[in-house]
Amino acid sequence: MRTYSPKPGDVTRQWHVIDAQDVVLGRLATTAASILRGKHKPIYAPHVDTGDFVIIINADKVHLSGNKRTQKMAYRHSGYPGGLRSVRYDELLDKNPEKAVEKAIKGMLPKNSLGRQMLSKLKVYKGDQHPHGAQQPQPFEITQVAQ
């Protein structure tokens, strides 16, 4: 019997919705990255995008443990000399919580074209409403929440 290698046409994608309220950011990011990569499926292969779509709601209510909210920094670089910019996570979460969640998940995906393709299946929203009701997303429960 030959080893099965999934083809992009063989993959059936589902939609999952994750409520980020009172969930630790790192735990949320690892769960979402695993679903985006398709590691929860028996046909997982690292060289094929077998992942599902992920909708994250209540991104503004995500929790950071310890003093990370005030001490952890988010960095970006413009590409020019001296172009390193940094912002504290509490400022980033207040100004643009969707970007903070996307940045955490993006760091857990492959750093190549396949990772960018996986990241395009991630949808993050600030409130508890999302425009993807027609796709009939299944709720995905993260059992361990912040204390």
From Swiss-Prot:
Keywords: Ribonucleoprotein, Ribosomal protein. One of its GO terms (molecular function) is mRNA binding. One of its GO terms (biological process) is translation. This protein is one of the early assembly proteins of the 50S ribosomal subunit, although it is not seen to bind rRNA by itself. It is important during the early stages of 50S assembly. PANTHER family: LARGE RIBOSOMAL SUBUNIT PROTEIN UL13M (PTHR11545:SF2), RIBOSOMAL PROTEIN L13 (PTHR11545). Part of the 50S ribosomal subunit. This is Large ribosomal subunit protein uL13. It comes from Streptomyces coelicolor (strain ATCC BAA-471 / A3(2) / M145). The lineage of its organism: Bacteria, Bacillati, Actinomycetota, Actinomycetes, Kitasatosporales. The gene is rplM.
